[in-house]
Amino acid sequence: CIRDRYISFRAAAAIILALLIVIIFGRKIIDFLRRKQIGEDIRDLGLEGQLQKRGTPTMGGVIILLAILVPILLFGRLDNIYIQLMIVSTVWLGLIGGLDDYIKVFRHNKEGLKGRFKIVGQVGLGIIVGTTMWLSPQIIVREKVTQPVQTVYLNPDGSVIESVQRNVVLSSESTKTTKTTIPFVKNNEFDYGWLTGETSAATWLLYVLVAIFVVTAVSNGANLTDGLDGLATGVSVPIVAVLGVLAYLSGHIVYADYLNIMYIPDSGELVVFAAAFAGALVGFLWYNSFPAQIFMGDTGSLAIGGVIAVFALCIRK
C-alpha cells in the first residue's frame, strides 16, 4: 500500500499532485467564476490601483482546499490522529469561509457572515483541537528520564580534586503533557501546568483557551491579508515550509535527540500534509500573484490561517 511507504516519498507525491490539481483545474475554475460573475468587492484601503481589482473572481480557496484534501486522502495515513485533526480543521474552516463568501456574492450582502458566527466557529474548532490534544491517547510526547550522577576525581593520595554532578539519561518514556516549545531556543520547554499548579481541570481549561486564542488569532490574521496580489499565499508558503521541517524533525527520534528537541511520536506524518499544503499554495500563487486573476476569499484565507495554527499546536511549536 502506498500509505506504508516512506514519508519522504509520500510527501513528494503529495506536493506534485497538489500542484497538478491547481494547474489543471485552476484555469477552469477561474473561467467558471468569471462566467458566473462571482467577483470580489474590494475594501478601499487607499492603495494605488486597488479599486481596479474590483470584480476579480473570488472563492478561489476552493482550489486550495481541493488541492490539499485530495493528496492527503490518497497519500496520508488516515488513522493518524494528527492527520485527522488537520482534515477536520481544513473542512471546518473552509465551510465557514465558504458560507461567508456565499452570502457576500450570491446574497449581495457585503458584510457576509456575521462576525460573531465566524468567532463561534473558530472557538468551536479551538475547543475540538484543545480537547483532542488533551484526551487522545495517541497524542503523547517522549520524554527523557534522567538521574543525577556525581563523579569524584581524586589525587593519588586520595584527596579530592574535583566533584562533578551531571544528569545521565537512563531511558525515555511516553507521556501526556501540556508542554510547548519555542524553536531554536535552548531550554525551550514551557509547561502550562506550571501556571495552574498541576491541577488537571485547570490545566485542561488553560490549554483549551490557548488553543482557542491561537486558532482564532491566526485564522483572522490570514483573513485580513487576502485581497492584495499574492500577499496571503506569499506569506503562508514559507511558514508552511518551516512547519513541515519542524514536523519532520520532531517526528524523527534520531534527529529530535541529536537536536535536543521534543520528540513527538507519529507527528512526522504531518510532513505529508505540509507538502500538500505547500504545493496547493505555490500553485495558487501562480494565479494570485500580480496581476491577480483570482482571490481566495474567506473560503481560503480562514482555512489557511486556521490550519497553520492547528499545525503549530500539533507539533507544539
Question: Language-model segments: what does each one mean?
Answer:
Residues 11-17, 46-55:
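Glycine-/proline-rich flexible loop or hinge segments
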Residues 44-53, 85, 108, 192-200, ...:
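Short juxtamembrane and helix-loop transition motifs at transmembrane-helix boundaries
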Residues 3-30, 64-95, 102, 116, ...:
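Alpha-helical transmembrane segments
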